[in-house]
Amino acid sequence: MNQRQNSSHHKRAVREARLAKLLFAFIAIASLAIIIFILNIPSIINNENNLLTKNVSTTQQNSSTTSEDKEVHTARITASGDMLYHDIVYGSAFDGQTYDFKNDYEQITPLVSSADLALGDFEGTINPDRPLAGYPIFNAPEEVVQSIKDAGYDVLDLAHNHILDTGISGLKYTANAFRKAGLDIFGVKVDPNEGILVKEVNGIKVAILGFSYGFNGIEASISQEDYNNHLYDLNMDKVKAQIEKAEEIADFTIIMPQMGEEYRLSPTDGQIETYHKMIEWGADVIFGGHPHVAEPTETIEKDGQKKFIIYSMGNLLSNQRIETLDRIWTERGVIMDITIQKDGSQTTLTSVQAHPTWVSRTPINRTFQGYPAYDYQVFLAEDYLPGAKYANTVDETTRQRIEKAYHEMLELLNGSSTNSVGGSNLTPN
């Protein structure tokens, strides 16, 4: 009996010893786990903070992207008419050693340079390998480029009937002369692979196209290959394709076509039909040229948006005037001033203003090829209204001539003249 009891006590003692060891091992493992957890708390917190920061950053980025998508962008764009350097214009600028054109655009520089994008129309060529000429062939001194740049112009239209006056070499030299000065050109191609000119202006992509009705017959002297590689005409299938392409790659499309009847104060049926088709195909604004006088404007509603046409902006600079052609409208022009707005994916025309111009021609103390020379300047007509800043700088007869040009120009553009196309209720300035 005692032996049996001793054996039983021994077995119980062994079991208790094993349980004690197991309990001790469990406690040790649990303690170790707690210690490891405590030591890793900062890392866990840091990871959670990193995750939180990442989530907040992503949220902020998404918010920023949404904000950018909703941001409204605006841009002011100006456009003006023909720059025609007749021989007396460039000849008067020659002082015996150099050509100085700095006065030409001095008074319009504040307006032109204040625009986010300024478009001009250089009607002629620059080719130092050919003689200078000012009618019927136009070939100006290269010094004109700097004066145009100094006036604030950004882009020049070269699609016009005089671009072949000094051949394909003249076309290329003209384009490259402006590009060398930091200006863009459109309406011709130096490289056949050049695409549509698109200027990004304050976050708005603006496509600019130019087309000419013809090239004074000089195109017959070049190959078909050169014609196709370098010129943009008014082949309507090609025009349509260009406009549709512009609509794909830009937010807003501007066209500066050259067509119409010279010295006519209203558009031809062909102009109206052609420009309406351009609007139908996607153009937003059309700044017309070629007639050497201004023609009326028109606003068209399309898809709930306003589209704008000016059939001709007239001359900006030339020797054409009442004294030389007995045509008073040739000394008058207009600088168009529009504002466009991009809101999300939609870009619209929001305002249109007109700034009538007048070419001043005053005698200077020298001659050109035996003829009197002149100082040519483009005036902003609004600056010569009664009480305006330059009203007292000219004689009263001249001031009244400029004031008359101002009022009659706005009447013409707004459609108050005979044979108008409706007008646009333009704001004068």
Named regions from a protein language model:
Residues 2-11, 19-429:
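Acidic, metal/ion-coordinating pockets
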Residues 15:
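Polyanion-binding surface elements
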